[in-house]
Amino acid sequence: MAQSFTGKKRIRKSFGRIPEAVQMPNLIEVQRSSYEQFLQREVRPGVRKDEGIEAVFKSVFPIKDFNERAVLEYVSYEFEEPKYDVEECIQRDMTFAAPLKVKLRLIVFETEEETGARSVKDIKEQDVYMGDIPLMTDKGTFIVNGTERVIVSQMHRSPGVFFDHDKGKTHASGKLLFAARVIPYRGSWLDFEFDAKDVVYVRIDRRRKLPATTFLYALGMDGEEILTTFYDVVPFEKRTAAGAEGWATPYKPERWRGVKPEFALIDADSGEEVAAAGTKITARQAKKLADNGLKTLLLAPEALTGRYLARDAVNFETGEIYAEAGDELDVTSIEALAAQGFSTIDVLDIDHVTVGAYMRNTLRVDKNAVREDALFDIYRVMRPGEPPTVEAAEAMFKSLFFDAERYDLSAVGRVKMNMRLELDASDEMRVLRKEDVLAVLKLLVGLRDGRGEIDDIDNLGNRRVRSVGELLENQYRVGLLRMERAIKERMSSVDIDTVMPHDLINAKPAAASVREFFGSSQLSQFMDQTNPLSEITHKRRLSALGPGGLTRERAGFEVRDVHPTHYGRICPIETPEGPNIGLINSLATHARVNKYGFIESPYRRVADGKPLEEVVYMSAMEESKHVIAQSNIKVLNGEIVDDLVPGRINGEPTLLQKEQVDLMDVSPRQVVSVAAALIPFLENDDANRALMGSNMQRQAVPLVQSDAPLVGTGMEAVVARDSGAVVIAKRTGVVEQIDGTRIVVRATEETDAARSGVDIYRLSKFQRSNQSTCINQRPLVKVGDKISAGDIIADGPSTELGELALGRNALVAFMPWNGYNFEDSILISERIVRDDVFTSIHIEEFEVMARDTKLGPEEITRDIPNVGEEALRNLDEAGIVAIGAEVQPGDILVGKVTPKGESPMTPEEKLLRAIFGEKASDVRDTSLRLPPGVAGTIVDVRVFNRHGVDKDERALAIERAEIDRLGKDRDDEFAILNRNISGRLRELLIGNVALSGPKGLSRGQITAEGLAEVQPGLWWQIALEDEKAMGELESLRRLFDENRKRLDRRFEDKVDKLQRGDELPPGVMKMVKVFVAVKRKLQPGDKMAGRHGNKGVISRILPIEDMPFLADGTHVDVVLNPLGVPSRMNVGQIFETHLGWACAGLGKQITTLLEDWQAGGQKQALIDRLTEIYGPDEELPETEEELVELARNLGKGVPIATPVFDGARIGDIEDHLRMAGLDPSGQSILYDGQTGEQFKRPVTVGYIYMLKLHHLVDDKIHARSIGPYSLVTQQPLGGKAQFGGQRFGEMEVWALEAYGAAYTLQEMLTVKSDDVAGRTKVYESIVRGDDTFEAGIPESFNVLVKEMRSLGLNVELENS
């Protein structure tokens, strides 16, 4: 396989045996595709699909005024270019958004008074600005007010119809009460439910229940129609046969199966008895009777008793009703009907066994009998207290379920409904129909009769994903509907003939709804930017919480649990550990979301036991119809080897015959998410620990030096590429220039005139992430390197050579060491601190604003009252700290003074005033100082000035530096373009005939020497004889001019933005941001972890010479407790240790061979060793230079990939240990660093990938003497952020009580807490050097007294 630019610098050996049938999709595709469908920014207005913003506008427009004199129609929309690019938005705290322009058409009608005919009087079209819509960056994020945010996708219950029961909890008898619920995408919910008496009721929007037949009456049905819809009708005809009189009915075998008749069955045609009374008729007998020609049965009159009439018995001449449909027949009523001449009676086919009388009983309970009463009943339930009228009730009922404005099932809802109810309505049919309601009721009654299954709401076929686009579409619709009301009112109140569309529109509600969604929605989250993996996982997260979703309190176990349909769709491992467990999930690696919002997983087709190349994506509903084999089944020559293979049918694991199989998994890792797929030997870890491992990888802090893991899974490169942390080449080309901040590439693959032939990649240098970690990119290329499109040309945070590198490979020994690794503590070597192995840089941001106050403007200045020169040493003349200054807690970063109000003067001030005749300083010091716990280096300062405020010297210096940078970019790009065009011009001119030209060029054929005499800038003046060549020369000249103009225009545009004032909050004149880089070395109290959930806190840093060492004198870096493994069952870490040990051993061998070769030995020995390690199929570098680079990179260890569920076996590990010349047990003899003695038994030593987590002791340590107090209780605040105190709670009080330490206790509860007067006195006495104090009344007692008084209980304190 062809290797990438970084791939050939360090080849990762894979142990995977199963070939990937499908390439991994882009990991942030979920976000991107959803938002692209919403905006349709690249699609021309005429051909846009009816989705996203287009669908919203079409659903709200046209808007008519109240008397229909005018209509405002929607034509199309388009986005303008965003005002600032992503980088500028982050720097200026702005939102990266594009203005939305909508073309609207206002049509005004006039009506003729005589005829009432309408005609168009006027049509006006206009583009109207409808606010800004945030744009998504290439990384799938949004920049809102300068911070990167992610919109998390939401899982919610799919629209459609669901059947369920109460699990026997409602009624004491444990009877199952079935219910059906029709859930639309938007609109009222419709519930049908049984009660304990088997009567069917309906609820609309969970309000008071009504008999279900009321709803059917409202739909226009009558009692007889309802009964004949739900039940078959059986005719009984009065007849005499063989002297016996009875009622004849057609014989249907299925109706008599398993029945024990109370009376003899007689053949109505022959008069014979075909079945005796009291004997059970078997299925075989019933069929045999039909085969013998039995057509009609004659039953005794008693057989009709207890049956129900299917139709009204009416005398059509007199109109008299003898019996109504649904009436129960008894002997008397049967005789009465026979006496009235009814020779045929139609009854309902209800036998109370397979068909129950539920709808008939409901009809009996229902007191309504006509549609009008039913509508009134529904109206009273929905709008209690309003007197109903027929029109109002009719309109309300229609608007509830049958009006597309108010009710929308959505395409998904209709598809789901069609599937569940076996209907075939078009998915354009978004409202309910009578047929739907009847089908729901029939299925519900069928469930009660024991036919069919209820739905599983946790099945992923019944849950769907709402991604960014859909969430924003719903929000925007709400905003437009608010706007619609305002437009209608305005259309009625203005002179419609003179207004233009923009006069009618106030876009604020629409813009506000978008702003509110991005700013404060539960699903719009501050991006977790700790490292590239945490970014990617955040974008792939699925949350069941949020508006329209679940709440933590209400969610039970079932919703949170892993479901068989999660396989290949949602990761069963990665989920938070707290109250959100199971509610927040992660998308599996290969999963994607289809157009209906259902998660699909890929499968390979299998035909006749042969896996095909074809890959299909299936949702949970489609998958249930297939037989699926696992991906690790043996396949030889395109055919499955084993006759029985493991697989699953409908989610249940089983053994299958290979002929049964019609699908198979594409990859073993398709089950898990990205974070879980990064854990090697995941298959050997307990699931709980794997969960912690995948969660802790997201908390790994980017280190100063990153190492890709020796033992990886092959996912590292994919994650690094898709996360956006690395820089990827857009086009094939050659590296022209390079420095720490940018890479300039001359494109070689295309000569498209419209596109520049130069790509300039700007690198992020020491930028602050959302979590204050450091974003820094480093180039991987050299000048002259040839790169291809898609190659990684610069590493980012936590990446190395284009692979994810969250931590470092550390040499670990599993052994106890003097109790310093008790309870998961970690003992580390001083070498790790000395060599900055786990050192990280954190960038803190501080900002200060100079406001215009009532007493005058605040000022940012170096001139601060009562501050010595020492404190100002780092400030420049503008009062702002210099870049590169080392600062300590309490140092001034930005000097600022605030005007003081006129306060009454003290006698001393009056004296000074009298002597010097001037006002003492009238400003106070409000400078920005570095808070405690932060010390570091200033890496960046940004100054923002309000429009029209003069810039200080520092702001101008920053601006000049930025303009120089932009100018350099422009000049470099122009120079390369110029060189390109000059080269093409040179090729064109040489050999052609010149008619005229600049001075120094002779006429006739142009030669290279002749051309060299003339400056390249003058070549344009040459006139050629060949017209075609002259045309090419002109087009090159045009291209040259266009490029120059384009570059100049872009430069001027950027400079103009720089020089313009900044948009600051109201009342702010100037704002300064200071960025401090803090270097955090590893220290006791920091939290570290491996990738297998093996976490611990550093207990001690031991001098190198005291650490245990190997026979060759190498000291180990980390000592871990072996007791942390057995009970936790994360054995993966032991396998990783052994394999890491083998990798390092092989690396040492390669280094030795390389040194031998460079010292004059054989190159072939190195190549042979590499071939032995990688196998004969691996492509090794062709040039010596590349081979040396590869060997150097492998010196630290040969990196290997052990994919999840398809990784290295124990045999492979032993083979590699032997290959590296190590003991196949993976254990080594260790010596005690303190005594030099050998430990009693061999110890497991090897390399583990260790991470430093974002729980650093420096961020947690905190102390306070005095500080802020709570306003009401006057007790100290809590927490480091508020500079709070230590809580002295109930239990601590009990402890002091137990010791009888009365004075200490009194001190804790009064002067050290909320006795305001007492604590002031203590402060004074400490200043005096006195150590006595008096406790007063705590403020909390006063609060209690006030609360009692508010309850009307007067409490007064008496001095006794």
Curated annotation (Swiss-Prot):
Q: What reactions does this protein catalyze?
A: RNA(n) + a ribonucleoside 5'-triphosphate = RNA(n+1) + diphosphate
What are its E.C. numbers?
Answer: 2.7.7.6
Q: Which UniProt keyword terms apply here?
A: DNA-directed RNA polymerase, Nucleotidyltransferase, Transcription, Transferase
Question: Matching InterPro entries, A to Z?
Answer: DNA-dir_RNA_pol_bsu_ext_1_sf, DNA-dir_RNA_pol_bsu_external_1, DNA-dir_RNA_pol_su2, DNA-dir_RNAP_su2_dom, DNA-dir_RNAP_su2_hyb_sf, RNA_pol_bsu_bac, RNA_pol_bsu_CS, RNA_pol_bsu_protrusion
Q: Name one GO molecular function term.
A: DNA-directed RNA polymerase activity
What Gene3D superfamilies is this protein classified in?
A: 2.40.50.100, 2.40.50.150, 3.90.1100.10, DNA-directed RNA polymerase, beta subunit, external 1 domain, DNA-directed RNA polymerase, subunit 2, domain 6, RNA polymerase alpha subunit dimerisation domain, RNA polymerase Rpb2, domain 2
Q: Name one GO cellular component term.
A: DNA-directed RNA polymerase complex
Is Transferase one of the keywords?
yes
The reply on keyword Nucleotidyltransferase is yes
Give the Pfam families listed for this entry: RNA_pol_Rpb2_1, RNA_pol_Rpb2_2, RNA_pol_Rpb2_3, RNA_pol_Rpb2_45, RNA_pol_Rpb2_6, RNA_pol_Rpb2_7
Q: Which GO terms describe its biological process?
A: DNA-templated transcription
Q: Which domain of life is it from?
A: Bacteria
Purpose: DNA-dependent RNA polymerase catalyzes the transcription of DNA into RNA using the four ribonucleoside triphosphates as substrates.
NCBIfam families in the record:
PRK00405.1 (NF001616), rpoB (TIGR02013)
Describe the family membership recorded for this protein in Swiss-Prot or TrEMBL: Belongs to the RNA polymerase beta chain family.
The record's note on quaternary structure and interaction partners says:
The RNAP catalytic core consists of 2 alpha, 1 beta, 1 beta' and 1 omega subunit. When a sigma factor is associated with the core the holoenzyme is formed, which can initiate transcription.
- Descriptive protein name: DNA-directed RNA polymerase subunit beta
